[in-house]
Amino acid sequence: VIERRTVFKAALAAGAATMAAACTSGGDDGGAQTGGGATAEAPPAAVITAEPAADAKNVPVLQPVTVKVAKGTLTEVKLTNADGKAVEGKLSDDKTTWTSSETLGYDKTYTYNATATGTDGKPVTLTGSFSTLKPASTVRVTLNPTDDATVGVAMPVSVKFTSAVKNKAAVERALKIETSTDVEGSWGWLSDQQVDWRPKEYWPANTTVKVDAKLYGIDLGGGAYPRADVTTEFKIGRNQVVKIHTPDHKMNVYRGGSLYKSYPCSNGKDSDVNLNTPNGTYIIMTKEPSAIFDNARYGYTNVNKKWACRFSNHGEFIHENQDNAANIGRANTSHGCVNLLEADAKNYFDSALIGDPVEITGSRLGPVVTSDVMDWLVSWSAWQAKSAL
């Protein structure tokens, strides 16, 4: 906070002479009045003040610049950057206060020039310069989903930073979620570089979501500041949920709460718990018409499979595996993925949205919570505990 204030007062020769006359009231050396009585006091000159003060350093970029006048009205105020470009501002209705309405830049010098007319009818001017804070570093911030995306009902809002955030509470306070339908949700930090917002329950279908991350000017910690504010607006699509109870060898797809499709599948190998398809609620993260799979530990490299929908950063996909057709619908023999017949894999691929939930039950392997997309793998109370507020 800038403590110093600058006050400029007109030093007008005529005004000085008038004040001298008023103080002495005219007359002889004894101070006796002559003529028709005391001389009337001159109208006061305008007094202009500005904040930040002249020569102020490290001014916060979110602090508005204000220019005020007492004993008069402002006739002109200009605030310019080092390139001479004017900064937008607004004059109050009574013409006594000017306030900037444009955000200032980091590590910039600004100059203000103000003119006012006092009650004495005479002009007064004020000129000064100040400089804004210089970040130790600037941080790129990204938002997902992106503008105009249509996503599934389990899709979280994800805010990622290119460096660690220390002042997490300050960041959360600057993040705003607006929805077309009332939705209860919470922010939760998955790491020092990522904070997500997820609803308590799956999003209502067809909800419009607006995210406003007003982060510019907020100290993330250690003098690191975001480069800019970021925003996004996206839509939640139809309600579609994949449910797989691994012992059943079936992948059921529900739409709007009713069974939509049922596909025979082969899940992670039952005989090796490390290859089980892990329990938990995941989301479709990516969709690839053709994907290359490599895992030399388990004896395969450069294997091409079609219609691959990733649902975990642990390495699990829903994809076709025609080579495993003999076991699909009969036995769990995969390396952790959900294997489908090619036609079924294509059919599901075409129906899926990024953000669709995938619910896995019946496995001996518990949820893998090391992923940066693990929002639905913890209870609601555990998720709320990840908030910094």
For each predicted feature, which ranges?
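Acidic, low-complexity Ser/Thr/Gly/Pro-rich repeat segments typical of extracellular/periplasmic
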Residues: 2-20, 24-238
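Extracytoplasmic/secreted envelope proteins and their assembly/folding machinery
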Residues: 66, 111-113, 127, 158, ...
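Conserved beta-strand and immediately adjacent loop positions that scaffold enzyme active sites
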Residues: 76, 113, 174, 250, ...
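Short amphipathic beta-strand/extended segments with alternating polar/hydrophobic composition
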Residues: 90, 188, 258-267, 370
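Gly/Pro-biased beta-strand-loop elements
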Residues: 139, 223-326
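Exported/periplasmic cell-wall-interacting domains
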Residues: 153, 261, 276-279, 295-389
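Structured segments of extracytoplasmic/periplasmic soluble domains
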Residues: 160, 164, 168, 290, ...
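Short, glycine/acidic-rich beta->alpha junctions
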Residues: 195, 243-246, 339-344
